Amino acid sequence: MKKLDKTNNSNKLSYQKDGTPYCQRFDDIYFESESGYQQSDFVFIQKNKIGLRLQIAKQTFTVAETGFGTGLNFLLTLQAYQKAQQVSSFQLAPLHFISVEKYPLTKEQLVQSLSILPQLQSLALTFINSYPDCPVEEFGQEFKTTFFNGQVRLTLIFDDAAQGFSSLNCSKEGLVDAWYLDGFTPAKNPDMWSKDLFSQIGRLSKDQATLTTFTVAGFVKRQLRDIGFRLEKLLAKGKKKEMLSAVMQSNPITNKGYYLRPLITKPQHVSIIGGGIASACAAYALTKQGVKVTLYCKDTSLAQGGSSNAIGALYPLLHQQEDDISSFYQQAFWRAKALYTEIAEQGFSFAHQWCGLLEVSYKEALIKRQQAFESLNTWPNELIHGVNAKQASELANIDLPYGGLFMPNAGWMSPRDLVKQIFNAAKSTTRLKIMTDTHITKIQQVANPSSNENGTSWSLTSNQGEFNASVLVICGGADAIEIEQLKSLPLTATRGQVTSMKSNKKINKLSTVICHKGYLTPENNGIHCIGATFQKNDTNITTNKADDDYNLTMLTKCLPELSSTIDWQEQDISSSKARLRCMSQDHLPLVGAVPDIKEHVATYSHLAKDKNWKYSQAAPCIDNLYVLLGLGARGLCSAPLAADILTAELCNTPYPVDSQMLFNLSPNRFIIRDIIKRKIKS
């Protein structure tokens, strides 16, 4: 490996009275002793959403940095990975941290500089022990090491920033997920902030890559815009008052303008119509971003619709091979489990158990399906794996004659309690106002109010009077289908009835959720839940005996031995509940701005002749009207990730999913597909 070709690469440091490391070459400090940890954590870790993105990453997550300096940002990222792994029940995807440093510090300088950061001492010691123990002049061109049994890789390139990054290879999809533009300011270190550097940043960035930096210099902003970043200037912390946050909007998306979501100024206030799991997750995510929220719930109390069941199962919808549906639900599942764990750890308790879920292979078609899962091995074992009848019986703690597919990280919870506690967590921010017994029956657009910097607002008509919403999000489940502005969306209401059964000594030891054509949950408060029916074109939520009989019959038909052992009779029914699900055509939620159908047809009409026709025009949408709908029977799984996507759209923060998945969830996907299939004439 070649040596550094610079003749003066050593860095002379001095230390201020409080221990702050000071660089004589650039006449500036590396970080402040009192607030450096908090400042860097806020700008680079929090504003890039590193912790969340590490939890949901499917492939190696790559961070690139200009100016390694003392290694503070790397250690913060290492700490974020450690914390994310601690709250995760599965092995995180690997992390690769790449940093370019023209003037590296010696091991002795690192020891002294990092000694004033007690929050990072353990990780700092591990890092320093692996660092080159020789003069800077003898460093190679790069240094590599690993942490956490190889899960985290560090690549340090000792070179000029632009030159160092030019040595990296990447595919057309890009390499870097998040950028830390650190190093000293353009005024102090102008050579680093070159046009060549920004060209490399553009070349290496993935679609939706994020970037943060302390500098807000005009030159930097212009260069970032030129290479495709969307910018937002934010308040920083400590003595550094401002910062930049940016998201890459790359060329492949602009070839399909209908993939682009509308940009709005982050609203100070958002109104939500709902009361169940979707609105709870949306309210929580928005209030955590500093947005004030008013919730309008038609019922006298929360969680009275589809989220009102006593027990519900949380598990992903997976197919043998990875496809759009499976890809979304596996990511949504991990996000849901992380959020619900977070809520519980904050002290907002709800009945739940991570006991796993068993999909029983009770017939030949399901046996073949299980064999396909096992042979293809598409998914990691911690998500799903096959078990035989003996293993299934041990997992369930009851005798089962069949094997099946086991999801060890799945479980059950009380949706009703969970929803209320998520709302309580949102209320603890003091940014949530809840108005129950307020049924919004009509919404009407109000043009150009002076109070709304995003343009039009909405007038809401209810049984409690008129209200105004600057930005409106509709999460009202099946009720939303009746709102005039949403009738063009292909949503349907499907009735479902769940039956609660009294436990007995033959089934009370059940220790995992069982799925067949229906499902059977473990005992909670003396009951088990079985279900559920699926009835289209039926909006009557009055319970009936026929549906209870159906739920019991399905258990008997699919698992006759178990049903015979339990011996449930009609008198063992504790209660029943019927509610409506809001379903989409493709079994994926609808998240985002409501499309203007007429403008879509006018704008994208040539897709009917050439589906690959390139458009730069962003999707025309109805101003300030958003939905989080179509969660169907899987709201527990899909709501948290969908809420994160909605919040990213409203707050101009990085999306937690890629551009293709964004389109797969976009409310305009149906009209685009219909234009391509020539179902709609322009």
From Swiss-Prot:
Functional summary from the UniProt entry: Catalyzes the last two steps in the biosynthesis of 5-methylaminomethyl-2-thiouridine (mnm(5)s(2)U) at the wobble position (U34) in tRNA. Catalyzes the FAD-dependent demodification of cmnm(5)s(2)U34 to nm(5)s(2)U34, followed by the transfer of a methyl group from S-adenosyl-L-methionine to nm(5)s(2)U34, to form mnm(5)s(2)U34.
PANTHER family the UniProt entry points to: SARCOSINE DEHYDROGENASE-RELATED, TRNA 5-METHYLAMINOMETHYL-2-THIOURIDINE BIOSYNTHESIS BIFUNCTIONAL PROTEIN MNMC
Protein name: tRNA 5-methylaminomethyl-2-thiouridine biosynthesis bifunctional protein MnmC
Region (FAD-dependent cmnm(5)s(2)U34 oxidoreductase): 273-682
Similarity comment text for this entry: In the N-terminal section; belongs to the methyltransferase superfamily. tRNA (mnm(5)s(2)U34)-methyltransferase family.
UniProtKB keywords: Cytoplasm, FAD, Flavoprotein, Methyltransferase, Multifunctional enzyme, Oxidoreductase, S-adenosyl-L-methionine, Transferase, tRNA processing
Pfam (any one): Methyltransf_30
InterPro entries according to UniProt: FAD-dep_OxRdtase, FAD/NAD-bd_sf, MnmC-like_methylTransf, SAM-dependent_MTases_sf, tRNA_MAMT_biosynth_bifunc_MnmC, tRNA_MNMC2, tRNA_S-uridine_synth_MnmC_C
Region of interest (tRNA (mnm(5)s(2)U34)-methyltransferase), ranges: 1-249
Gene Ontology, cellular component aspect: cytoplasm
A GO term, aspect molecular function: tRNA (5-methylaminomethyl-2-thiouridylate)(34)-methyltransferase activity
UniProt lineage: Bacteria, Pseudomonadati, Pseudomonadota, Gammaproteobacteria, Alteromonadales
Catalytic reaction(s) noted: 5-aminomethyl-2-thiouridine(34) in tRNA + S-adenosyl-L-methionine = 5-methylaminomethyl-2-thiouridine(34) in tRNA + S-adenosyl-L-homocysteine + H(+)
Principal localisation: cytoplasm
EC numbers for this chain: 2.1.1.61, 1.5.-.-
Cofactor(s) annotated in UniProt: FAD
Cell compartment(s), UniProt: Cytoplasm
